Amino acid sequence: MRGQQTPPQQPTRVRTPRENENEVLGVIEQMLGASRVRVRCMDGKLRMGRIPGKLKRKIWVREDDVVIVTPWEVQSDEKCDVIWRYTKGQVDWLNRKGYLDFMR
């Protein structure tokens, strides 16, 4: 069936932020270059996020992507590491479950 799009897959498991590991949901607001992004986090803070070297080629992020970040031990209000990016189906699931209410 050429030209027809397949319906989006329902995610079977969606990784949620682990509070005991200090993980926070965020949305990419701006690409800064040099593996840096500006992230609006669910705790209301605007942080500069870094994509670590081991994930640089695995995680391709764009503006408005929903990600999981871990704030740094030092300067935790200003800087963070991006550790996970959600797909479109996973973002829909997070919306339905109420995880993305901070974006409104």
Swiss-Prot record:
Record-level Gene Ontology MF annotations: RNA binding; translation initiation factor activity
Domain of life from the UniProt record: Archaea
Start-end of Low complexity biased regions: 1-14
CDD domains per the UniProt record, alphabetical: S1_IF1A
Record region (Disordered): 1-20
Keyword terms of this UniProt record: Initiation factor, Protein biosynthesis
Entry annotated with the keyword Protein biosynthesis: yes
Domain S1-like span(s) in chain numbering: 12-87
PROSITE patterns in alphabetical order: IF1A, S1_IF1_TYPE
InterPro entries: NA-bd_OB-fold, RNA-binding_domain_S1_IF1, TIF_eIF-1A, TIF_eIF-1A_CS
Function comment: Seems to be required for maximal rate of protein biosynthesis. Enhances ribosome dissociation into subunits and stabilizes the binding of the initiator Met-tRNA(I) to 40 S ribosomal subunits.
Family the UniProt entry places it in: Belongs to the eIF-1A family.
Name of protein: Translation initiation factor 1A
Source organism phylogeny: Archaea, Methanobacteriati, Methanobacteriota, Methanomada group, Methanococci
